[in-house]
Amino acid sequence: MKGMREKTLKSLEFDKIVKLIANECDSELGREKVFDIEIKKDLKAIEFELDLLNEAVKFIYSYGDISFSFQDIREHVKKAQIDYILYNRELLGIKNFLSLVEEVKAHFKSLYDREDFLLLKEFDKRLVPLKSLKEKIENTVISEDEISDEASPVLKAIRRQKASINEKIKSTLNSIISTRQKELQEPIITMRQGRYVVPVKQEYRNVFKGIIHDQSSTGATLFIEPIQVVDLNNELRELELKEQKEIERILFELSQEVKKNAEAIFKDVEVVSELDFLFAKARYSIKIKASRPELNTSGYVNLKKARHPLIDPEKVVPIDIHIGREFTTLVITGPNTGGKTVTLKTVGLLTLMAMAGINIPAEEKSQISIFEDVFVDIGDEQSIEQSLSTFSSHMTNIVSILKKVNKNSLVLLDELGAGTDPLEGSALAMSILDFLHRTGCRTIATTHYSELKQYALKTKGVENASVEFDVETLRPTYRLIIGIPGRSNAFEISRRLGLSEEIIENAKSYMSGEAIRFEDVIKDVEEKRKDLENAYQEVERLKKEVEVLKEELEKEKRKLESQKDKILKEAKEKAREIIKEAKQTAEEVIKRIKEAEEKEKNKDRAIQEIREKIKKNLEELEEEVLKPKEFSYGKIPDSLKAGQTVYIVPLDQNGIVLSPPDASGNVEVQAGILKMTVHISNLRVKEEQEQEEVKKGYSRFINEKAKSISPSLDVRGMTLDDALLEVEKYIDDAYLAGLNQVTIIHGRGTGVLRTGIAKFLRNSKYVKSFRLGRYGEGGDGVTIVELHSR
């Protein structure tokens, strides 16, 4: 910690804040940076730190937190710079750090198109990923004890040879064990001094040929390398030496790669350490629900709902305090343990936090001034719960403060003038406040001397404040009230505790009349303040209720507007879909007609002749039914029924009514091969005497239709779309033909056709009911459809 005297930092417990932030760090280097935090005096520098901090806070809220955990690898890199060989553990540490750099870069990718993370983007630019070096280490070093076979072709070949010789040795030893069990203590293979041996009984030492490498503690067992594997063991040992030499060569090469990238690694370490420090501040800010302070250099402090960050959040009482505009000196009076010292420490600590680029636990838009120095007299190494100050230690400290203070200082004095005779102490306190007031610095002092209350009332630029005390509960509320001096409350407290009224009245007689009147005035002002505050709170409550109601009404209005827009939009979309579907259906029909015609051309002559004959008959029928001789048309019809012939005005064509008009006046009409819906206003009916002739023509048409309609339709093997087209046409024809019941054969299969057809039938206005076939009708492979009567 630097930038402020140590006594101030400790008295205000800033060192504890630093430790809490350090606990949020992931790396040792990040913690080092926290403990090296600086209390800055330059406004731009502090604003920059706060900008950076609040980008980190926003990043955590937007994208989640990042871990910056890594070990300090700087010493490893320095060793590589002087051509030392780095071994597995050191290289793995470097590899892990380089992986972290890549992870951080990946986290910051989401910021590339964001304009509100400019400072974090600069960190991203400073980070240099060393992917090639990371992959080389990754492909070489498997663990702290193992190098990969793939590290080099030479190493791979050596290890292959080793494996082969190991197999030979074990095979030979297994053969010895199986044939000479009597001479062995146990049928096992073990190792001594890097060579394969077997445990031989002492009495067979001269019989069992080989080299003795060890013996048991009792001497009963000798560990002998059989003569048959001595050469193989020698060869294995040579390969192990070659392997070690190759590994050292590989590690040296990797160390040289680290050396080449040393500067980039050092820079990355610095950037990641800074980020760890920054995100630790951000985590702490989120944890204490802090906000960014507004800074100034005019000496103005205005804290709203400020909380001391070291007090339990469940117990801390937020305070509102301001100084530096209407007054530059604030005298806080009130009972001991009432929260006066906490108020001093809160102002001082939050000022230091802001100057260190740390968010403060207060409401947004709280204001903090940047001071050249912060002077504190709150006892020697005092904590909030404990006071060890004496008059002499107070005065020594105050003398030092008075020598150094200037107009750009913040001075915090606890229990000014305490520890000596009250008359002399209060006189000294007023004189010290006079001196500080003349320098123009910002001073907050606490006291329980009533003389200082009167001094504050009489002196321009000096203001009283008090810590509220609840006489009912005999407890301080810890709320700070600016503008009203505190009362001792001694008489009220004594009365509540049971002291007789006689003694209390007698005590008052020892006080001067002026002192009693002063206390009564304070009491009266305090009561009126409480009444006003209660009234204000009621007004605020009502205002909030009105705001809530207003917001609810606005929300309801927006909801209705949104629903209106949504309904209109959905209607337009539905219309577009209907038009699109109609076009697609028309195109599909045209396509099918063309395909059918194309197929017709390829049929033999006999079918062609039949087709021509049918066509001729249909044309004659159409001429007779749908295109009769010129008739005179009357007015728009009042009502229509199925079977009537009508003139369709927009098409200049006759058509047959398929169903009566619906509630909206829309009529379903058949014109040639096309079926359409037309509004009744676009239809005309024939004269009465000619209508009968048309009806006869229509009847002949229906009779012809009935003859050609089969009582069943087979759609097996078709796709659902094709089947639905066939079913729709079939149902229309069957209804026109006057059939009461038809059968649709769809087969069992997967059930897709059955389900799709059932859905269509459910929505068809011609269908009265439908069901699956019963036994003897085709079962669930068919659907029996009952049609409405025409």
UniProtKB/Swiss-Prot annotation:
BP term (GO), one: rescue of stalled ribosome
UniProt xrefs under SMART domains: MUTSac (SM00534), MUTSd (SM00533), SMR (SM00463)
Keywords: ATP-binding, DNA-binding, Endonuclease, Hydrolase, Nuclease, Nucleotide-binding, RNA-binding, rRNA-binding
InterPro entries named in the record: DNA_mismatch_repair_MutS_C, DNA_mismatch_repair_MutS_core, DNA_mismatch_repair_MutS_sf, MSSS, MutS, MutS2, P-loop_NTPase, Smr_dom
Signal peptide stretch: none
Binding site for ATP: G334, P335, N336, T337, G338, G339, K340, T341
Keyword Transcription regulation: no
EC numbers on record: 3.1.-.-, 3.6.4.-
Domain Smr, chain residue ranges per copy: 713-788
PROSITE patterns assigned: DNA_MISMATCH_REPAIR_2 (PS00486), SMR (PS50828)
Top EC class, one word: hydrolase
Pfam families the record matches: MSSS (PF20297), MutS_V (PF00488), Smr (PF01713)
Molecular function, one GO term: mismatched DNA binding
Assembly with partners or alone: Homodimer. Binds to stalled ribosomes, contacting rRNA.
Family: Belongs to the DNA mismatch repair MutS family. MutS2 subfamily.
HAMAP family reported in the protein's UniProt record: MutS2
Function: Endonuclease that is involved in the suppression of homologous recombination and thus may have a key role in the control of bacterial genetic diversity. Acts as a ribosome collision sensor, splitting the ribosome into its 2 subunits. Detects stalled/collided 70S ribosomes which it binds and splits by an ATP-hydrolysis driven conformational change. Acts upstream of the ribosome quality control system (RQC), a ribosome-associated complex that mediates the extraction of incompletely synthesized nascent chains from stalled ribosomes and their subsequent degradation. Probably generates substrates for RQC.
Listed name of the protein: Endonuclease MutS2
Provenance organism: Caldanaerobacter subterraneus subsp. tengcongensis (strain DSM 15242 / JCM 11007 / NBRC 100824 / MB4)
Gene from which this protein is expressed: mutS2
